[in-house]
Amino acid sequence: MRARLFLGLMAAAPAAAMALAVAPAAAADPGVTVYPGMEIRQGSTLCTLGFVDPEARAAFTAGHCRGDGPVTDKAGHVIGAMALFDDNTPDGATVTGDHQIADWGAIALADDVQINPVLPGGRALVIDEAQAVSRPGQQVCHFGVVTGESCGTVAAVNNGWFTMGNGVVSQKGDSGGPVYTLTPDGRAAIVGLFNSTWGGAPTAVSWQSTGQRIREAVATQPASSNTGIEAAISFTSESVDAGVNPPA
């Protein structure tokens, strides 16, 4: 039996909804709860989970967090498998504002995990398109498993990514963690996934840019390449099925 994952991320584009159908990941240990801001591991890589969608049974983190084997929590309990990813994060290169950075990983959650879309601090993490990062000075917070929650402001808005300062801190292991704004009703609206530190400034990829990149990644895969992951992109007037290669 296959588990169909309707990526809630695509709610940011009302005209389209995307689903990934994957062979179910290895069964999770009963009682494992998955939530944004938790520690996740894949092989020897330790990162932070950025967003979970209970209805979709999907989760998101940084693409450079991928590793060997299933995705687990810090105790080694299986929570799912990396279904798709993209990562063009420069290694040792000088990055300018016009450089477009992609860094996302989509996780198909195992059937038995419990999903709680609430940050460790108690705020529900939601999608609110009106809260997108658009200007320097905008207030944001970041949660990483190493540094916890830190808040500050957007320093610069670049090509699909932004830098932060005035209180936002990070350490290795915070990658993939959620960056969010606080809403008047007491929730947190996701605006990015933590990427790295460039020029001493904590950096995140834009949630809106990430959504667009996922749509493009799925839509451009040839149907003949289907080797176990199936993507269906449904538009208001048409439906297109395309095969998607799993990550190598």
Each model region followed by its residue ranges:
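Generic low-complexity segments that are intrinsically disordered, proline-rich and/or Lys/Arg-biased
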Residues: A15, A25, G31, A223, ...
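Hydrophobic alpha-helical membrane segments, chiefly transmembrane helices and signal peptide h-regions
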Residues: A12-A19, F51, A106, S196, ...
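Cross-kingdom Sec-pathway N-terminal secretion signals
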Residues: A21-T33, E39, G92
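Serine endopeptidase catalytic core focused on the charge-relay Asp
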Residues: G43-N158
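Secretory targeting and sorting signals
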Residues: M1-A28
